[in-house]
Structure formats: C-alpha cells, structure tokens
Amino acid sequence: METKRRYKMYKVKKHWVTIAVASGLITLGTTTLGSSVSAETEQQTSDKVVTQKSEDDKAASESSQTDAPKTKQAQTEQTQAQSQANVADTSTSITKETPSQNITTQANSDDKTVTNTKSEEAQTSEERTKQAEEAQATASSQALTQAKAELTKQRQTAAQENKNPVDLAAIPNVKQIDGKYYYIGSDGQPKKNFALTVNNKVLYFDKNTGALTDTSQYQFKQGLTKLNNDYTPHNQIVNFENTSLETIDNYVTADSWYRPKDILKNGKTWTASSESDLRPLLMSWWPDKQTQIAYLNYMNQQGLGTGENYTADSSQESLNLAAQTVQVKIETKISQTQQTQWLRDIINSFVKTQPNWNSQTESDTSAGEKDHLQGGALLYSNSDKTAYANSDYRLLNRTPTSQTGKPKYFEDNSSGGYDFLLANDIDNSNPVVQAEQLNWLHYLMNYGSIVANDPEANFDGVRVDAVDNVNADLLQIASDYLKAHYGVDKSEKNAINHLSILEAWSDNDPQYNKDTKGAQLPIDNKLRLSLLYALTRPLEKDASNKNEIRSGLEPVITNSLNNRSAEGKNSERMANYIFIRAHDSEVQTVIAKIIKAQINPKTDGLTFTLDELKQAFKIYNEDMRQAKKKYTQSNIPTAYALMLSNKDSITRLYYGDMYSDDGQYMATKSPYYDAIDTLLKARIKYAAGGQDMKITYVEGDKSHMDWDYTGVLTSVRYGTGANEATDQGSEATKTQGMAVITSNNPSLKLNQNDKVIVNMGTAHKNQEYRPLLLTTKDGLTSYTSDAAAKSLYRKTNDKGELVFDASDIQGYLNPQVSGYLAVWVPVGASDNQDVRVAASNKANATGQVYESSSALDSQLIYEGFSNFQDFVTKDSDYTNKKIAQNVQLFKSWGVTSFEMAPQYVSSEDGSFLDSIIQNGYAFEDRYDLAMSKNNKYGSQQDMINAVKALHKSGIQVIADWVPDQIYNLPGKEVVTATRVNDYGEYRKDSEIKNTLYAANTKSNGKDYQAKYGGAFLSELAAKYPSIFNRTQISNGKKIDPSEKITAWKAKYFNGTNILGRGVGYVLKDNASDKYFELKGNQTYLPKQMTNKEASTGFVNDGNGMTFYSTSGYQAKNSFVQDAKGNWYYFDNNGHMVYGLQHLNGEVQYFLSNGVQLRESFLENADGSKNYFGHLGNRYSNGYYSFDNDSKWRYFDASGVMAVGLKTINGNTQYFDQDGYQVKGAWITGSDGKKRYFDDGSGNMAVNRFANDKNGDWYYLNSDGIALVGVQTINGKTYYFGQDGKQIKGKIITDNGKLKYFLANSGELARNIFATDSQNNWYYFGSDGVAVTGSQTIAGKKLYFASDGKQVKGSFVTYNGKVHYYHADSGELQVNRFEADKDGNWYYLDSNGEALTGSQRINGQRVFFTREGKQVKGDVAYDERGLLRYYDKNSGNMVYNKVVTLANGRRIGIDRWGIARYY
C-alpha cells in the first residue's frame, strides 16, 4: 500500500521551505502535486536546512515549473477566489525517494539588474557566471539565517491559514486516475480548462488533458535573453526612407520587406546593400517566440533550416542561432538564383499559416451559424492612426424600415435589413458617395449614348439590387432621377416605358415606396411566400424540416398586397410585381443545401468548386424530374397559372423555370416549359376583366387520403367589360376570361356527391369552354387550340357555371403537379385575340408613379438569366447572342420588359458564389460593362446588339443597378476595423476590435472608374437641380457633387468582409501595444532593427514579474501570450497581475501563476459558474453562443450562468445542467408538468400548439403547461390525453359520448364519417357526438347502433318495424327482398320497412309474418282469416293443389288459394 504524506512549504521572505507530514488533505498554494520533495519527518526537515548550490539555483530559475512568488502587487489585487495561504499542504502518493534538498531557497536580486539567460549552446561568460553565483550565494545565506528564526512563526501562520484544507476525495466529481486528479463532467469525460473554487482555493484542470494542475508554478522560463548578436548591426534597417521598408500607409505588415544595412553575400561576406537588396522582415525579426519557432520549422520544410524541430521549450538563444543559420542558407540561394521571387513566395505562404495573420483570428463563422455571408464583416471606425479613412457618416442599416435610424414601419417587425451584405460595403449615407451613385445610374441608363454613341443601346429601366442592404436615400435619388430624366411621373405610358423594379424583400418596403411615391415597383413578397408554402413545399409527412411544410391554399387569396377574397377584392390596390423563383431565390439556396448535404459538408454551400457545382446540379436536375422531390420545388406550373391569371400584379417570368439553370443558355428546356409556354400565350388572349378567387371545401373521401385538406381553389377572370360575375359584358367578353382550378393535395379524392362549381359569370352562361391545361397521372397536358380539345368541351349552365365532380378532379403526384391543376378558357377566341391594354398618356391623380391598372397588368417581365449558366465553350453560345436571336420567342410569350443579367466584368477572387460563377454581381469596376474584356454573357458588342434587338421588337430592357458593394479592389489601405456581424454589431470575443487592418479599398486610378466617376455630375446638376437640392432623409444632407470619386478609398466604405489577414497582419509590438510604422522621426520599429540593445523574456524586478517582447520593449498595460499559448496581463507599472481584475471595462481572472482564464469556466464555492471567453472577458448580462453558434447560454449581471427555469426579460426559458438553453424541446419539471421551449427563441411556449420529435402535438396554456382532456381553443374543440398528447384520427369517449378528432388538424369532427381500428363506421353530427339510431345524412338513410357503430348488412327493428341496411354503403334498403343469416326473407317497402301480412309484389301474392319473415313452404292465415299456402321456393301463393306439410298433415288448396286440412 502506498504511503500518503503531506508536504508543508513555509515561506520565509521570498524563499520556500518544504516539510513532509503524513496527511490526506491538500491546500493548493505554490507547490505542485508532483513536486520533487523528500519524504522525511517534520523533525528531520527542520533540522536539515541547507543551501542549494548556485548551479541548482540557476537550473531552478530556468525551469518551466518555477515558483510563482507572492508579490506586493499580487496581494493588493487578490480576491477571495485567489487568496493563497503561505502554507501548502500536498497530498500525493510516494512510491520512491526523490533526490532533493529538504529546504530549497531561491535568490532574487533586490535591485533591478537582471541576468540574461543563455542556452546550453552558448554558455554564459565566466564573469557573468561568477557574478550570478555570488548573488545567489548572498541571497541563500540571508535566507538560511532567517529560516531558523522564522520557522516557528511560519508554522503558526500556516496552521491559521490552513483552517480550510481541500480534501480531493470529498469533491464528488473529482476522480483520481493513474495518479492524477480529474474533474468528471456530466458526460462522463474529464472537464478541460476548468477552474473550481473549494474552501477559498482555486483548483485548475489543464486545458489539454483535464488533469489537476499546480497553478503555483510559472509556465515559462524566467530570465532575459539578449537579442543583439553579431548579425544585428548588419540586419538593421539602412535608413528610414520610404524605399527602405515596404509599408501600407507607413504601417509595417507581416509580409513587409526592408533594406538591411548589409547583406550576407553568398552566405559568407557582409556587403553593403543596394536599393534593390530587400529582404523579408521575417528573416531577422519575429513578433513573438511562437512565430519564430513556426518560421524555423517552416524553413526546415523548405530545405533552408537546421533540420531540428523547435518547440515552446526551446531556449530563445537556440532560436536566435538557428535563425542565423537560416539566413545564411537564404543568402546563399539568393546568390545562386540571382533573384528573390522564390523567397517572396515562401514568406507569403508562411504568413498565411500563422493564426495572427489568417482567418483563425477573425472569428470566421463560415463553417457554423454564419453572421455574414462571407463568414464575417469588418466595420471601419474613425481613429487618429488612420485619419485618412475617417468618415462623418457610416450610418448603418438605414433601410426603408428605419431610414432615420428609428423604425417607421411595422408590417415587418424586424429591422428591415442590414448593411453588410458582401465584399467592400459602400457607405451610401455619405453625400459624396450618394452623388457618385447618381452619376453611375445615369451612366448605366445612358450607356449606349455615352459609350457607343447609339441611343438605341440605352437601357430603359432599372432593377435596384439588395434594397434592404443599402441606405434608403438611394431609392429616393433613383426615383428623382427617373422622374426628372424620363418624366415617369408625367404619364402611365412614360412609367411603363421605363418600368423599374426593386429587389425589396421586407414587408415594410412596399408601404415606404408608396409613401415616397417611388418610381419602382415593389415585390408582393407576401404573395410570393404564400405561393411557396401553399404549393412548392413538401407535405408534412415528407418534410425533413417541419418549419418548411405545405400550408393550405387560403393565404394565396388573402396574404398579399392585394387581397383577392370576395370581401377584400375591392379594397385599395397597390401596384407590384410577383415571381416564384429568381436567380438568387429558391435556386442558390437549394444548390447550397445539396452541396452541404451530399458533396462537401465542410462548406457553407455558397463557396464551392466548379466541380462541386456540377455534381450538385446533377442531383438538382434529377430531383426536378421526380414526382416526390427532395430538394426542388413542387407545383411550379400551378404557381404560374395563378400569377399569370391574377389581376393587379405584374408577373416576372424566371429563366430557370423555362430552361435548366445550368448548361448553355437556352440549351435544355425545363420539365415545366410546355405548361408555362401555354400559360404565357393564353394570358395574352384570355386574362382580362374582373377576378374572383375562392376555395371550395369538398367533403372528400378521407378514408383514401393521406392528408385531410380538402380545399380546392378556383380563380376566375371574367373578360373585358365584366368586373363581377353578374355583369353582362359585351360581345368581346364572350371569348375572354379564364378559370384556374387547383388543389395542393396529391391524395385528394372527391366523394360521389362532391361538386366544385366555378362561376364563369352571367356573360358566359350556356357557353362552351375547353381545357387549356389538364392534369393526368403522367403530368400536364396542354391544349393550345379549340380543335385540340374538341372532345373535352364543356358547357356552362344557365347561370354561367361550370360544374366539376369526382370524375374531373382528383389529386395527382407527378413531376409537374403535386395536387391538381386545370385551366379552362372559352371556345371561339381568334388566334390573334389580344386582351392587353395600352398605357394612358395621363398622370395618376394620386401622384403615384405606378397604380394598378389593366395597362400595368398587361406587362410581363422576363428575368432572362440564371446565376448558374455554364461558361461558354464557343463564342456562339454567349447569352447576349442568344437573346438577340430569340426576341420573337420572347415577344410570343408576351414579354414587355427584359431584365438582363448584370453586365459588369466579374471579379475572379472566388471569395463568394458570385465571383466563383462570375454572374456579374461581383465586380471590381462597375463602369466596366464588357469593355476591358468579355463578361460571362459576351462582348460589349454582343450586349449592345441584344439591347437593340429587344428594342426593335418593342421590348424594353432593364439593367441591374448594384449599389451595395465592390469586390477585390487592387489597392490596400490600413484601416481601423472591428469584427462585426451583418448589422454592424461587434461580435463578442472577436480579437479584431479597433484594430489596424489592411483592407482592399483602393482602385488604381487607371480603370473606368477613373474615367467616368463623377463625370456627369455637373451636367446633371445643371439639368436637374431638384435632385441636388433635396435634403436626404438618413443624413440630413444634400448629395455632394463637389468631390468626384475617380478612385475608391476606405473613407467611402462602411467596411469589408474578413479577408483572411488576421488580427496581427499590421504588425505591432504587443508588449507596448504600439504599431510599427515608418514615419520619419516618429518611426517605431523593433529595437534590434535599429541596432539598439534589446532583450526578451520574463523576469522578476523585485516588485513583480515583468516581460520584455522580442522587439525589446517592456509590457505595460498590455496582454502578452507566451510560447505555450498562455495569456498574461501587465499593469501600468509593467507587473504581472493575478486574481480577479477589472480591465478595460471587463472582468477577467488570472490564476496564481498569472495565466489568464480563457474559454474557461470558473465554478464558485456555491456551485454557480462564471465563464471567461475567448479574450478572457467574463460573460455577463446576455446570451452567448457556444459550439460554433449552435448552442446558447445566458449569464446574469454578476456573470452567473443560468441553469434551470429562468425568467429573462419577461420570458420564461430553460437551461440544462450545463447551462445550454433548451430550444425546440420538451421539459418535464419537478411538478411533473410538461413544458415546451420554442425552437427559435427558446421561450416557453404559451397559448399555442407545439409538437415533439415523435410528431405528437400538445397545447400549452398561459402557464406553459400542456392541457389535457377536451379543450376549446380559438373556437375549435380538441382533445388531449392525460399525457398531454393531442388525439388525432381517433375515436374517444368523453363523458359517455363518442367523439372523433380529425387525423390532420385534430379538431373535433363534425358532420363527418370516421372508422375505428376494426373498420366500424361512425358518423359525428354537428355537435361532434357520434349519432345513434336512424339518420338521414347527405340524403341517405342510415342507421347507427347504440354504441355509434353504423349498421351494415344487418336487420334492425325500431319503431316496431324491421329495416335492413346495405352491407357496403349502409343505406336503408327499399323496395327489395333481403334475407337474414338464417335464410329468412323480408321485403322492404318504399320506406325501408319490412312488410307483414298478405302482399302482392312483382305480380306475386306473398305473405310475411308479423316479424316480417316471408312464409315459404307453409301455411298462414291472412287478414281475412283464410288459410293460405305459399310455395316453398318462390313464396308465391299456391292454387289448385294438394300439399303435404312439413308436419305430415295434408291440405287441399282450391282455385281461390284457400287451403283446408284433410
């Protein structure tokens, strides 16, 4: 058995005395659990006080386990959490004697002279060694003298301070494994980087292994190493001229090269440098030890190193010597190759490997829950360090919702958008920038005139890109320009001739556009979403994401800018445009999902290789051709049938719905092409007049339906001259109008009595109609002429109604339709019938540029491109060539406005989808429309030809105006930046905060921006002064044409996306927290670079621990990281701090060895927990994300982590034992009640339904508790079991009454049939209770037993009469014979009652007993008392015959059928 002993260490001044005592306790102070100590008795220890030799002292000073002394500074900064006793009790297992002195004394110089520690490779000089030994001996002598005198006092002090020792065995979660102690978490694994407070002592469990670690020992070697050597005078910078050091705005960067005073020619001879002799700064200097180690190991890989692997434990002097070896090899190779490009490549590659110089220190979220499309954004801020980039503006998120900075519209309760979308984010609140945006818009609209001297090549209208990501002032500026330049507010014709649209997703945008009398049309995004969810989403049973499931059809009528219900259709209308898919909507999101799910799970799906894209489209295109789709959208033709037939909206047709999104332009038709082509051409001929939409809820045959939704939507257009169904119209009305009939239920089955009545209007009574589209099991069939559908003609009745039943309408599932679609049109229209209406020459009285009208309805926009068209393989495949060749096709579809792809030459930086596929949205020079080279769509001339061809066919052309961002500018500027999310909010724990950062913000002054930037402002100011005189809303300023932007600079931007340069690419000395810059007499560089004396390392100056950087500067008011990755803070006196600290407005914690807790929990004595984040700041007053933003915790004002049920900001939430907020989950509380916490907010669900992972539904009341029993909610009745689960599709007994709750909604079933598990049928009446007895339902007479079961194939006696109900239908049988199971026959009369007595049926005289049984082969007395006999087979009365009865008696029957016994 191992012997347990306790080791006490007594502190005498600055020296420690170790004593062994048998013990089972530990108080953590300043010794390690594995300390090298002797297991002698206390008495022996006290008698053996010796002084270590100076050589041992030196070794101790260089040990990584150097004792951390208690300094005056540390004591004043202590808190309860880190107070230390001077006596340390250690519990450990001793298995062998360890050679050691019983008392170890360490000398520290009282003056501020420090000793430079030398590596074994370079021994200190004899003189320095002697001095050090003398100093150590003196200190040791003093300690020895004091030790005996103070030992007794120290023991007494230790006993007092050790009243609360730590018993590791008593801590429930602390377990000893292989001689080490670990804290075992709830998951059964050791917790790592975890601190625990026990009896006022802090136990720390290692961040790598989780083992309990002694925090009394420093993690670094003490001592200074001189940085100056024989190379230093030669490697110093030759002078401070700009040509001698590569900088950005005078700041030095990680890949900077400089001109040294001398070069080591051929690796042998120091030779004065020339102006061309530049060398990488990283050849002779490194910002810290860890970077130098990485450099040396990297150079080993390049064949330029020593071959030795260097680690954090390598001495500084050994690293310096190795760097000299590398320099020799570099210079040798330069002499051999006579060039340095190879070295630049190596250095550039090395820089990218270092965390401080790459995205590892940029809080990149690309792989998790992204807070920006490119993984992160940087906001520029004003600073004296970068005054040239300062701005008075950068007013963020001034969207239409919040143009003044405060929300004005609340249809959409969000902020309505955010500023940081992509790349260099333009500051559109800056008046100079606003003027430049106007200049560019004018250039774009007049491109043909300006560049080609050809007005026919000008654009007519504009699509404003990303409205919710730019300053809303731009919308007003653009509207002002369109009004001034084209007079779009002067007449409807002008407006339509220059049709412009907004990519505006927020529901607040249309109202803003109306209030500001905008010259562009908004999206009806409400209707778009309604169509998406009602038609294209999967059924709930097929959906992997239960938030993305198919809804009913009702929102298609009412959830729109223009309500089309009977009650809402005459309300105020708003002009708009509508689409179901677009180049960047419902396409790239699907492709991203496929890539992430099936090809490359490490990508976000928005950055990919072209090969990955090709693989994704193979899956995408195959899925589109499946009936049951996994990724792509269902019912695309149905969406077009509704959009194209709608009144009060312009449809935008999307290229990708007609052709495959990938492949060469127009090469491959989509599976929807024929149906949409038919609808487009039919719209020209038929879509006119008033409109009515409604939903008919058929009863349906639910026993054969997977989904019990029975709504069938009908949309009718009456034709010109008929605005209502009752209008007579004119002769022209007869051949106009159309009906769309649709269901979104692929399992829909009408019952035999269901009817769908479509009122085509009085103008169309007794008129023949034909199908335009019909759904079959294989897809949609198009009928493009009357003759093609002649056999299917159907006539309206005298009310003008078309009537459809189960033989016409049912659900289908095929690649084109998931549900049902039919379109009907009147017979007799001429081939050239065109119901479209010309625009008026009058202005709208309201002052609105666009108002809903027949002329506006007559327009059709074609978004004629896809993001994902392949790059051409031959010139003839260019998009713009194909457009010019196919204008007649577009015209036949009714296209009036062709929206072209953005024609800008694309950036090829590959940083985001747009620049990978080069779709034109990622540009570096926005004035370059295929001018410097071909864009993806063709040459400049191809574009001009396409525009002119469209114009020649009467089709206007819409250009894409993208005022939000500019990609990949060639010039860099150093800016002051902070890592933010897309709203410009600081990302907690990001290292980049008011940090100097090199961004790509400058254009080169030689591009088209230089030629055309600001070039037209003077002309525009003279022509349209009103634009320049308007005060803009967001900034209160007029646009400023005085400054022409011929070159972009940081001052014109809000910021950029993270660029992968890291927090430290712009170099600074972390110790002094000052950036290196070349600035004349204010130049600040590493000391050794100017041949000044410099040393580096940690050293105690007698008052505390200090640090000197690898640039030779002392750390003050700064954080420092050692080579092992530990962080420390040095105060304004340059001393290391300990314990709980308040620094820069944040609370932080430092262990007793100075190591800062980072990404670490500290569990307090009361069990509460604090967390110190990535920067060591204690989390408080908010929610914080963990695990790549996938989980959340909450910390209160004191930094305590929430656990259990908590009320935060008025919301009840639940946090598990690890502090993670529970979302989308059920929790059973200590009261046994179930509660659900929302999957989005995490708030406890109240007054709403929620479902569990098994698909069971519950209803949570106002207390968040699941209801049980029968409940009436929002006027509907439901039933919940005692476990809270909603009963669906089941029959239950409630207070003795049978009730049925629908399988889909769970509502109490009324007026409906339902079956139980035994296939017994029930009918539930208007009160929801199962009926009993005789019932007439839907005109059918049925019978239900007392238990509610429908009687089928049985006889029932009630009201004294026998009745029989059909075995299949259950209907009461009338006027027919039926037999019972014993073979007895009955005849049911016209009332369904069994006849009795003598009866004449079908010419036969028969007889039935009082029970209704027919008499056969026997006698009976009739109502006159006469005996009669009835044939045993037919039952007919017998005449003139002698018969022997079954009982053996004989009877004779006369000619009148009267029988007598013999």
Swiss-Prot record:
Stated consequence of mutating residue 137 to T: In strain: GS-5, MT4239, MT4245, MT4251, MT4467 and MT8148
Listed result of changing residue 113 to I: In strain: MT4239 and MT4245
Result, substituting residue 1280 to L: In strain: MT4467
Catalytically driven reaction(s): [(1->6)-alpha-D-glucosyl](n) + sucrose = [(1->6)-alpha-D-glucosyl](n+1) + D-fructose
Segments of skewed composition (Low complexity): 71-85, 134-149
Effect of residue 132 to S: In strain: GS-5 and MT4467
Protein EC: 2.4.1.5
Consequence of changing residue 1425 to R: In strain: GS-5
GO cellular component: extracellular region
Bias kind Polar residues: ranges: 37-52, 86-108, 154-163
GO molecular function: dextransucrase activity; glucosyltransferase activity
Outcome following mutation: residue 19 to V: In strain: GS-5, MT4239, MT4245, MT4251, MT4467 and MT8148
Annotated phenotype, changing residue 301 to H: In strain: MT4245
Role noted for this protein: Production of extracellular glucans, that are thought to play a key role in the development of the dental plaque because of their ability to adhere to smooth surfaces and mediate the aggregation of bacterial cells and food debris.
Effect of residue 328 to F: In strain: MT4239
More about this protein: GTF-I synthesizes water-insoluble glucans (alpha 1,3-linked glucose and some 1,6 linkages), GTF-S synthesizes water-soluble glucans (alpha 1,6-glucose). GTF-SI synthesizes both forms of glucans.
Gene3D superfamilies: Aspartate carbamoyltransferase regulatory subunit, C-terminal domain, Cholin Binding, glucansucrase, Glycosidases, Golgi alpha-mannosidase II
Record protein name field: Glucosyltransferase-S
Effect noted on mutating residue 1080 to R: In strain: MT4239
Biased composition (Basic and acidic residues): 109-133
Consequence the record notes for mutating residue 1282 to P: In strain: MT4245
Family in the record: Belongs to the glycosyl hydrolase 70 family.
Keywords noted in UniProt: Dental caries, Glycosyltransferase, Repeat, Secreted, Signal, Transferase
Naturally occurring in which organism (per UniProt): Streptococcus mutans serotype c (strain ATCC 700610 / UA159)
GO biological process, one term: glucan biosynthetic process
